[in-house]
Amino acid sequence: MNPRRLFVASCIALITSAFSFMIRQDIADPLAADFSLTKQAIGEVMGAAFLGMAVAMLVVAPLCDFLGMGRVIMLAWLCHLAGILGTIFAPKPPAVSADTSYWILWCSTFLVGSGNGLVEIAINPLAATLYPRNKTHYLNILHAWWP
């Protein structure tokens, strides 16, 4: 086990999570136009990421030791993948109703947010475990990547 490699991988995972939030916010208006969603509806879709993050942290964090950090990171990857693919391949009106599009986008965004929460659940204790004598220092470095 190479602590430096694991720490760098954790930083990259957090950067990826940060980019998922930034990109989703940048595409909010085009998504609303393409899927015939109101400003309120697209705001609810974007907010689903924060709900997903909170739910993932509340549900999975107490189980992190039982599941293991590797499994939590793999689950984060699966949530990110499913959420991104759900967004990319979501059917647009008139093929489906705007309501259906809304829920597909909402669930996809919830999954991406859950993935972001799962990344946090795994990398924070990992950094503290890798550097037990410098926990605060390395946790600060780790979170310097968050926008």
Regions from the PLM with identified roles:
Residues 5-39, 124:
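Extracytoplasmic
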Residues 18, 22, 101, 113-121:
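Small-residue-rich segments within alpha-helical transmembrane domains of MFS-like 12-TM solute carriers
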Residues 22, 50-58:
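Residue-level signature of mid-helix packing/kink "hotspots" within the transmembrane helices
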Residues 29, 58-62, 125:
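Small-residue-mediated transmembrane helix hinge/kink sites in multi-pass secondary transporters
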Residues 33-35, 40, 65-66, 97-98, ...:
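Membrane-helix boundary and inter-helical linker elements of multi-pass secondary transporters
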Residues 37-46, 101, 105, 139:
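Juxtamembrane helix-start elements in MFS-like secondary transporters
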Residues 108-144:
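Cytoplasmic helix-loop-helix junction between adjacent transmembrane helices
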